[in-house]
A protein has these predicted regions:
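Short, polar/acidic, helix-capping and beta-turn segments at strand->helix junctions
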Residues: 1-115
């Protein structure tokens, strides 16, 4: 079963890639590794989830933002491997950043949205 089929079974779909908004490459392949540039919670129809957790955004908003970011990462991987998911052996590192107020303490629940 392909990654895209597994996502479809979960009601998820990889987004179409948009051109970068700046002077950077979305991914770089080097010595069998693919490095993905930072990906954010960009919505399929345009725009993005913006704001701070604990100040207008709740845990569910944050988890959805993490999920969207993860889908964007997978879309970049798909582009890097030419849709041949067999080339993907493992994801070595995933780093999540959470914009939150100082009193917000549920960072793991937010980043878990990328799982």
């Amino acid at each position: 079963m392909t990654i895209e089929k597994k996502l479809e079974d979960l009601g998820l779909v990889l987004p179409d890639l948009k051109p970068p908004l700046g002077a950077y490459v979305p991914y770089l392949e080097r010595d069998g590794l693919v490095f993905i540039s930072g990906q954010g919670p960009v919505l399929a129809g345009g725009g993005a989830i913006c704001g701070r957790l604990g100040d207008g955004l709740d845990i569910e908003d944050g988890a959805r933002a993490a999920q969207l970011s993860a889908l964007n990462i997978l879309a970049q991987i798909r582009a890097a491997v030419g849709s041949d998911w067999q080339k993907l052996v493992r994801i070595v590192r995933l780093c999540g950043y959470v914009n939150a107020t100082p009193d917000f303490t549920h960072h793991p629940a937010v980043v878990n949205g990328a799982s």
